[in-house]
Amino acid sequence: MAKATAKKRKVIVESTGEAHISSTFNNIIISLTNKKGEVIAWSSAGKMGFRGSKKNTPYAAQMAAEDCSKVALEAGLKKVKVYVKGPGNGRESAIRSIHNGGIEVTEIIDVTPMPHNGCRPPKRRRV
């Protein structure tokens, strides 16, 4: 039986879109979407070949953002509104490298979820 080839889905790319940067303590994930939220390009520190503690570095975030913005720029994205979520290291360097990649950053919004005293946090590490 012949192997089914994966069909690449068509995403309508407008000149303006959104960049979602999810920065955790372990990894950073960057998604560039159109206004509807359909993903144009995505990248992460793990996808770029970083492993372990190297994934949570500003350099890894920079490399992931460069890779992502290059693909989106070729697709036709020109301006983005950046949504940043999480406490990780590479937030600023990811925004800076999206801007240096040729995509204009119009707005930066922090959407980090803050509990109104919800779940008990994990215990403090003693090293």
Curated annotation (Swiss-Prot):
GO terms for biological process: translation. InterPro entries: Ribosomal_uS11, Ribosomal_uS11_bac-type, Ribosomal_uS11_CS, Ribosomal_uS11_sf. Disulfide bonds: none annotated. Keywords: Ribonucleoprotein, Ribosomal protein, RNA-binding, rRNA-binding. Pfam families: Ribosomal_S11 (PF00411). The keyword Ribosomal protein applies. Signal peptide: none annotated. Gene3D superfamilies: Ribosomal protein S11 (3.30.420.80). The keyword Membrane does not apply. GO terms for molecular function: rRNA binding; structural constituent of ribosome. Transmembrane segments: none annotated. It comes from the Bacteria. SUPFAM superfamilies: Translational machinery components. GO terms for cellular component: ribonucleoprotein complex; ribosome. Located on the platform of the 30S subunit, it bridges several disparate RNA helices of the 16S rRNA. Forms part of the Shine-Dalgarno cleft in the 70S ribosome. Belongs to the universal ribosomal protein uS11 family. HAMAP family: Ribosomal_uS11. Part of the 30S ribosomal subunit. Interacts with proteins S7 and S18. Binds to IF-3. This is Small ribosomal subunit protein uS11. It comes from Flavobacterium johnsoniae (strain ATCC 17061 / DSM 2064 / JCM 8514 / BCRC 14874 / CCUG 350202 / NBRC 14942 / NCIMB 11054 / UW101).
